[in-house]
Amino acid sequence: TTTAYMVRSILEKSGFKTGLIGTIETIIGDKVIKASNTTPESYIVQQYFREMVDAGCDSVVMEVSSQGLMLHRVSGFTFDYGIFTNLEPDHIGPNEHKDFDDYARCKAMLFKQCRHGIFNGDDPHLDRMLEGHTCDVETCGNRHSGQVQLL
């Protein structure tokens, strides 16, 4: 969520009119809609995209949850960029993922649906996220793990 707001802020400051779909809210121009799911149902996402175009948005930042991927809420979408920050066992349980492997597999699905992937090279689960990816890969990190070194 924090990353989504940071990326949106960077895009806005760079002159892009940017919509947001995320855990807390959806922002369409001046309109703010409280979120009920991080990744809404696909027909709602399509409705939001249409409203964003009508509001003059030229970019969208969207949080895509493992649940959203697992439930095919973004099936058929091609994202320009996908960002992997980290993977922690916080979505395991009867209402989400049966185990960590299922959670990781669902998260990694994003990188079969984007053109460019930006990955945290310091995360111990990086290899799992790269399994089966079809996107260009860029890594960043604090250690010697990334193509881009963070200072």
What are the functions of these language-model segments?
Residues D54-A55, D80-L151:
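Acidic, Mg2+-coordinating active-site environments of NTP-dependent enzymes
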Residues V32-S65:
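Conserved nucleotide-sensing/catalytic segment adjacent to the nucleotide-binding pocket
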Residues T1-E25, K31-V32:
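Walker A (P-loop) phosphate-binding motif
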Residues G68-S75:
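Conserved helix/coil segment N-terminal to the catalytic DExD/H
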Residues E25-I33, I83-D90:
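Acidic/polar active-site rim loop that often engages polyanionic ligands
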Residues T18-G22, V60-V64, I118-N120, T139:
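General beta-strand structural signal in soluble alpha/beta enzymes
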Residues Q46-R50, L71, A108:
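Short hydrophobic/charged patches on amphipathic alpha-helices used for structural packing
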Residues S65-G68, D123-P124:
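Short beta->alpha connector loops
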